[in-house]
């Protein structure tokens, strides 16, 4: 493979020195194109679509210091192909709050080696550079996280140095050495002519230094301002910069580039800190530029070759550090401050680009100026963010990840560099050599002096400023000449005006007499106006008194209706309370009666048992006495014969009788105990049944009470709504009164202003006023009639709908109350029936009868004979006891039924009263609705008297001035301004009465706010009269006050008021919502900016009648 280098073929100087010092643009991040030549037509650098900056993150393992400090790991990656990195804050919070995940293009963990990072990040940019793109790769991160290791690494060379294919690098070689090796491998495979040049810049303490220059730091030529490296804007390309004073060295192999890289790296500023033993104290930019010669495919046998230029910038940024942690002092602290300042500026640039800010602070640091095109420019950019996994560096790690995340959103627009032909390149080089020779010759012959670019720019700007000043001086001289000419012309004009002024003074003096006559006529008109105003005020007060009376009557009726509703509700509440108290009393009486009956039965039972015991004991004692007597007699008779035999028999008989008595006594006691226990159990069951029934009754009563309370609350809410409506109506009327007062004040101001302007525009008004009056009156009244009908129809519909809804709600409440009453009565009837059946059946099923039957059977078995059974007192007492129990059961049953009947009758009476009350409430609501509807229908056309007559007659008086044919300007002297003479000083005019608010004017604004939203859609939009060219209303005066702030006020005549026809007025004034709306429409008819369209008629007879009166 034959390959050659362009500098070797062009000049022998390139082969001998291998370097050349020129002024150029070293990279696309430093400038967008090195040369200022016009490109050929073969490739104009078409731009590709926008692409985001690629962001990679590399996390190293813990170093020796972090292991010794026992700092935990807070960074976790997802393997060598992962794209997420997880930062945990190490606190004992919840899992979700203690960890945060970041996403990037790829994340390299501690297991990733240098080759993996190079293949994923920089290898593709070599091909992009060979295709003519400008590319940038820079490392960003905290100090000591491996930026220099990633970019440079180990630069030692292994293998055959002379062979490109057999050149090997160590495993710790960084991106820059690997780029150089792979670049020459790619170039050797192209079989094309090429050249490669490199540059190596260092930014230390905001000063640029060329690391490839032969001078040392202690060389005085380095500090010479003439030889310092400077940054300039590229005039040929607005988005790039140029670096002057930097060397570019052509290389023929990767070995030469690696040697230059090693020499420059040795000159770089490094220092030992607590964070890193070899901390880089400066930013470096290593630039590789390739020029590839290609043949144009469009040329047919002409053999025109073009040079394709590509650049790759490899940036190694200095690490940000905390001064307290790094232990930097004095000079090192100053270095750290400048490093952090430049990195902070870089972060601000990234934030501004992400936020799409109008201002990007590139010029605040030289670092951002160097990287201007790489951030948001026309290059393909890659950022490698290096971080530490230790917890002690967690804040710096989080800051680096945040910056990298924001930088991922920056968009660049990559663009292919323009291809240059060989001829143009040679021409540029020849021109550059000639320019340098001339500069060298001039400096040797001392025909010129060496100046810096800043001084040259200042000289050029001063020369431009001098030229501008000379032009200004010339323009000022021309203006002075014109001013002199204008001054002479103005003197002539002033002389003419003075003569005219004298003539006008004479004319004005002649017209003073006419003005005095005119003033007397104005006073007469004013007197008539005063009289009319007094009449208007009297009629207004009278109408307002009537309206106030009507309003008071309506309010009283509403109060009476509300009081009646409250009374009915209170009576209903009282009846319910009485019903509840009676029910509780009945229940208490039933329980007391039952307990009393049980006690009486128990006492009777005890007395009968005692009587039975007494009878049995007496019988037994009598029998014993008889037996004793018989035995004694027998003993006396047979004592002598058989004393011992009878004594034994007697003892046996005595013992047998005694045992019989004991058994009998025990049986009686057991029977009595069983009877008592059965009676107690039956009584307990009866009491439990009674309590359950009473509880169910209480539940029903409580449900009824809750239903009635809900009804009462609903009625209270309706009453409150009515009260709130009344309050709102009063508030609206107050607002309308305020608006009317403002209108009056505006009218007064308007009258005063028209009087002051009266002498200026009276003649113009008189000429046009008489011709337009009739047409304007007709138009206004036709339009007001149509609008009035439309709004009245809408308001009628609204009120009718609202009243119908109220009536429907009232009917629903009545239905619910009646249904509740019927359900309550049915429940009580079923409950009473159940109670009757339960009580009677349970009283009849008492076990006392069974016990008594058992006792009677045992007695009958013991006695044996029928006679003894019939004469036995125990059986008779048992039968009597059974009869008493049956009679008591019947009496209690009758009492309970009577109580149930009474309760049912009371419930029926209460339900009837509730029905009556609900019917009364419904009637009251119906009457209220009918009253409102009828009152609205009757008084819908009622209109209160206003100031229309006064204004119309006042305008008619103004028309009479035209008949006089006098000019009012004759009454004034030209020596004084006109505004000092416009208002006549007459005490009569100042004594005009104030147009105060009428009393209770709120009724005119009642329905305004309510119907605004409903009627806004139905209104028609009328064009403004002032836009008519044939009808210049803006010249009219006086102006009619209009309560519409966003439209110009047309100057119209006020038509005659309908109050002139007093016989047509109704004696009752409007007081409902409809009349309030009518008053609003009436005001609109008087004060409006909307003309009336001709041809529109209404069916309302009252409006037609009023229209006829006005016409």
Curated annotation (Swiss-Prot):
* Positions with biased composition (Polar residues): 1-11, 1017-1038, 1057-1082
Quaternary structure, per UniProt, is: Might be dimeric.
| Domain of life assignment | Eukaryota
Residues annotated as coiled-coil are 424-510, 648-670, 710-780, 808-828
Q: Which Gene3D superfamilies match?
A: Apolipoprotein, Kinesin motor domain
Q: In UniProt terms, what function does this protein have?
A: Required for assembly of the mitotic spindle. Interacts with spindle microtubules to produce an outwardly directed force acting upon the poles. Following spindle assembly, CIN8 and KIP1 apparently act to oppose a force that draws separated poles back together. This force seems to be mediate by KAR3.
Q: What is this protein called?
A: Kinesin-like protein KIP1
Quote the biased-composition stretches of kind Basic and acidic residues, using this chain's numbering: 1007-1016
Q: Which positions bind ATP?
A: 141-148
What is the organism of origin for this protein?
Saccharomyces cerevisiae (strain ATCC 204508 / S288c) (Baker's yeast)
Kinesin motor domain ranges (all copies): 52-410
| Matching InterPro entries | KIF11-like (IPR047149), KIF11-like_kin_motor_dom (IPR047241), Kinesin_motor_CS (IPR019821), Kinesin_motor_dom (IPR001752), Kinesin_motor_dom_sf (IPR036961), P-loop_NTPase (IPR027417)
Which protein family is it in? Belongs to the TRAFAC class myosin-kinesin ATPase superfamily. Kinesin family. BimC subfamily.
User: What are the recorded Gene Ontology BP terms?
Assistant: 2-micrometer plasmid partitioning; cell division; initial mitotic spindle pole body separation; microtubule depolymerization; microtubule-based movement; mitotic sister chromatid segregation; mitotic spindle assembly; mitotic spindle elongation
């Amino acid at each position: 493979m034959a390959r050659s280098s362009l500098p070797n073929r062009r000049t022998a100087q390139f082969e001998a020195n291998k370097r050349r010092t020129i002024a150029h643009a070293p990279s696309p991040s430093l400038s967008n194109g090195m040369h200022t030549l016009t490109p050929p037509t073969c490739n104009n650098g078409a731009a590709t679509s926008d692409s985001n900056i690629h962001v990679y993150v590399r996390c190293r393992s813990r170093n020796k210091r972090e292991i010794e400090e026992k700092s935990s790991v807070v960074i976790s990656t997802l393997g060598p192909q992962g794209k997420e990195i997880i930062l945990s804050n190490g606190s004992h919070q919840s899992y979700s709050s203690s960890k945060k995940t970041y996403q990037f293009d790829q994340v390299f963990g501690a297991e990733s080696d240098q080759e993996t990072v190079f293949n994923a990040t920089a290898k593709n940019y070599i091909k992009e550079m060979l295709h003519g793109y400008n590319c940038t790769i820079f490392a960003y991160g905290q100090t000591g996280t491996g930026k220099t290791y990633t970019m440079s690494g180990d630069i030692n060379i292994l293998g055959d140095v002379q062979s490109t294919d057999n050149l090997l690098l160590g495993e710790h070689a960084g991106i820059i050495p690997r780029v150089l090796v792979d670049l020459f491998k790619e170039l050797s495979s192209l079989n094309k002519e090429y050249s490669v040049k490199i540059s190596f810049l260092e930014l230390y303490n905001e000063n640029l230094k060329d690391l490839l220059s032969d001078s040392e730091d202690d060389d005085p030529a380095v500090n010479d301002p003439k030889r310092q490296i400077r940054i300039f804007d590229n005039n040929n390309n607005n988005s790039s910069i140029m670096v002057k004073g930097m060397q570019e060295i052509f290389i023929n192999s990767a070995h030469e580039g690696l040697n230059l890289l090693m020499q420059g790296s040795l000159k770089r500023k490094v220092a030992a800190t607590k964070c890193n033993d070899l901390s880089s104290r400066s930013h470096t930019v290593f630039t590789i530029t390739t020029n590839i010669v290609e043949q144009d495919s469009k040329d047919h046998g002409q053999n025109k070759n073009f040079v394709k230029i590509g650049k790759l910038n490899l940036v190694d940024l200095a690490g940000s550090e905390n001064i307290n942690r790094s232990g930097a002092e004095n000079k090192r602290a100053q270095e750290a401050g400048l490093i952090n300042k430049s990195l902070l500026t870089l972060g601000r640039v990234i934030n501004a680009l992400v936020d799409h800010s109008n201002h990007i602070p590139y010029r605040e640091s030289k670092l951002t100026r160097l990287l201007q095109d790489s951030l948001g420019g026309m290059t393909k950019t890659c950022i490698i963010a290096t971080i530490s996994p230790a917890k002690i560096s967690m804040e710096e790690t989080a800051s680096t990840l945040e910056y990298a995340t924001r930088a991922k959103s920056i968009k660049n627009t990559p663009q292919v560099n323009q291809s240059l032909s060989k001829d143009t390149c040679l021409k540029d080089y020849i021109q550059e050599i000639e320019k340098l020779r001339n500069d060298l010759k001039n400096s040797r012959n001392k025909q010129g002096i060496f100046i810096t670019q800043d001084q040259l720019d200042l000289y050029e700007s001063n020369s431009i400023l001098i030229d501008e000043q000379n032009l200004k001086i010339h323009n000022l001289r021309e203006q002075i000449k014109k001013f002199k000419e204008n001054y002479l012309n103005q003197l002539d004009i002033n002389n003419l005006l003075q003569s005219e002024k004298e003539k006008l003074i004479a004319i004005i003096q002649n017209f003073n007499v006419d003005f005095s006559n005119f003033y007397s006529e104005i006073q007469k008109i004013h007197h008539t106006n005063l009289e009319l105003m007094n009449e208007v005020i009297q009629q207004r007060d009278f109408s307002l008194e009537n309206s106030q009376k009507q309003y008071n009557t309506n309010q009283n009726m509403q109060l009476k209706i509300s009081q009646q509703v409250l009374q009915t509700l209170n009576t209903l509440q009282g009846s319910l309370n009485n019903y509840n108290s009676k029910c509780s009393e009945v229940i208490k009486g039933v329980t007391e009666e039952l307990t009393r009956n049980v006690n009486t039965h128990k006492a009777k039972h005890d007395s009968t048992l005692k009587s039975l015991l007494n009878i049995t004991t007496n019988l037994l004692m009598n029998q014993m006495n008889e037996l004793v007597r018989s035995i004694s007699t027998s003993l006396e008779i047979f004592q002598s014969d058989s004393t011992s035999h009878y004594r034994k028999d007697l003892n046996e008989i005595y013992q047998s009788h005694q045992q019989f008595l004991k058994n009998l006594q025990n049986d009686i006691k057991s029977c009595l105990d069983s009877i008592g226990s059965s009676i107690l159990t039956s009584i307990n069951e009866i009491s439990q049944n009674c309590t359950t029934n009473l509880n169910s009754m209480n539940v029903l009563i409580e449900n009824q009470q809750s239903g009635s309370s809900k009804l009462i609350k609903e009625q209270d809410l309706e009453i409150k709504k009515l009260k709130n409506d009344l309050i709102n109506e009063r508030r609206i009327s107050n607002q309308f009164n305020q608006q009317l007062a403002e209108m009056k004040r505006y009218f007064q101001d308007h009258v005063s202003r028209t009087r002051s302007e009266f002498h200026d525009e009276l003649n113009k008004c008189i000429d046009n006023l008489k011709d337009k009056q009739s047409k304007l009156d007709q138009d206004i009244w036709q339009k007001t009639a149509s609008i009035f009908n439309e709004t009245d129809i809408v308001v009628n519909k609204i009120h009718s709908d609202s009243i119908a809804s109220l009536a429907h709600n009232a009917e629903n409440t009545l239905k619910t109350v009646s249904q509740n009453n019927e359900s309550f009565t049915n429940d009580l009837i079923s409950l009473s029936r159940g109670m009757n059946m339960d009580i009677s059946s349970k009283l009849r099923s008492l076990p006392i009868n069974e016990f008594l039957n058992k006792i009677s059977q045992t007695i009958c078995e013991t006695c044996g004979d029928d006679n003894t059974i019939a004469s036995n007192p125990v059986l008779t007492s048992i039968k009597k006891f059974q009869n008493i129990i049956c009679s008591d059961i019947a009496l209690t049953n009758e009492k309970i039924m009577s109580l149930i009947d009474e309760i049912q009758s009371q419930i029926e009476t209460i339900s009837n009263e509730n029905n009556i009350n609900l019917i009364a409430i419904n009637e009251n609501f119906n009457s209220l609705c009918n009253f409102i509807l009828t009152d609205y229908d009757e008084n819908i056309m009622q209109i209160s008297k206003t100031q229309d007559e006064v204004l119309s007659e006042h305008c008619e008086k103004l028309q009479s001035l035209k008949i006089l044919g006098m000019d009012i300007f004759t009454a004034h002297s030209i020596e004084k301004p006109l505004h000092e003479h416009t208002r006549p000083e007459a005490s009569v005019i100042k004594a005009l009465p104030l147009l105060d608010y009428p009393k209770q004017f709120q009724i005119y604004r009642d329905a305004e706010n309510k119907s605004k939203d409903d009627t806004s859609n139905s209104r028609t939009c009328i064009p403004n009269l002032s836009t008519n060219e044939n009808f210049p209303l803006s010249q009219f005066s006086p102006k009619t006050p209009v309560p519409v702030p966003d439209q110009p006020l047309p100057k119209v005549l006020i038509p005659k008021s309908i109050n002139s026809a007093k016989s047509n007025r109704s004696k009752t004034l409007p007081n409902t919502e409809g009349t309030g709306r009518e008053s609003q429409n009436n005001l609109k008819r008087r004060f409006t900016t909307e003309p009336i369209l001709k041809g529109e008629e209404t069916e309302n007879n009252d409006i037609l009648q009023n229209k006829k009166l006005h016409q």
